[in-house]
Amino acid sequence: MTVLSCSINTLIKEGLYEISGVEVGQHFYWQIGGFQVHAQVLITSWVVIAILLGSAVLAVRNPQTIPTDGQNFFEFVLEFIRDVSQTQIGEEYGPWVPFIGTLFLFIFVSNWSGALLPWKIIQLPQGELAAPTNDINTTVALALLTSVAYFYAGLSKKGLGYFSKYIQPTPILLPINILEDFTKPLSLSFRLFGNILADELVVVVLVSLVPLVVPIPVMFLGLFTSGIQALIFATLAAAYIGESMEGHH
């Protein structure tokens, strides 16, 4: 043990064991107010938000009594989000439709942007642009936002009585119930991040090896799985909110 401790201390002193300094790929940073900001994520997230806001403006700008094809599409998306929210949350789903819808649409468009938008055209001093959900910072932020939402939902309905769920059905399960609230955002964030990162890496490798026909089916499969991941994230977020309001597992 003494030898092992000495070896670890030596590595730390020499700077070879600094886990916080390990990075995957190259990153481009901005310095804002003394903070180091991940510029790639901000740029791609702003593009996705602009696409969503532009689509929303087009959807509500001139509604017709006899809906057009575009209006039908947006109404279908809204009904789909309402159905997901109602199924998972229950009768009090109404106030949560905007939140669940925002999560679903942001993740869906972010995932698809990695395959459909020509990010490579934009040249950066370091690194390159990719889907926002390809970065662990984005998925962790979305997962933490979901955690805040279901804590707020439970506390707003039950007050401090919400915390009684941690000792149900028996106080022996208190550590497990507390641990569950930590594993929820972890599972949400790493599932989304891992799937999107793996999908983009597979496409990049196949394009470099066989740049003609073979990558195309994989890209279509990636689009499908990207949509499924957005649905899974939104459905689980709604389920957690419904669970916190109902108080069952």
From Swiss-Prot:
- The answer to whether UniProt assigns keyword Transferase to this entry is no
Q: What one GO molecular function would you report for this record?
A: proton-transporting ATP synthase activity, rotational mechanism
Keywords on record: ATP synthesis, CF(0), Chloroplast, Hydrogen ion transport, Ion transport, Membrane, Plastid, Thylakoid, Transmembrane, Transmembrane helix, Transport
Among Pfam families, the record links this protein to: ATP-synt_A (PF00119)
| PROSITE patterns, per database record | ATPASE_A
- An annotated GO cellular component: chloroplast thylakoid membrane
State the compartments where it is located: Plastid, Chloroplast thylakoid membrane
Q: How does it sit in the membrane?
A: Multi-pass membrane protein
Parts of the chain that traverse the membrane: 40-60, 97-117, 136-156, 201-221, 222-242
The answer to keyword Transmembrane applying to this record is yes
* Similarity field: Belongs to the ATPase A chain family.
Q: How does it assemble?
A: F-type ATPases have 2 components, CF(1) - the catalytic core - and CF(0) - the membrane proton channel. CF(1) has five subunits: alpha(3), beta(3), gamma(1), delta(1), epsilon(1). CF(0) has four main subunits: a, b, b' and c.
Q: What function does the entry list?
A: Key component of the proton channel; it plays a direct role in the translocation of protons across the membrane.
Q: Supply the name of the protein.
A: ATP synthase subunit a, chloroplastic
* Source organism per UniProt: Draba nemorosa
Encoding gene, per UniProt annotation: atpI
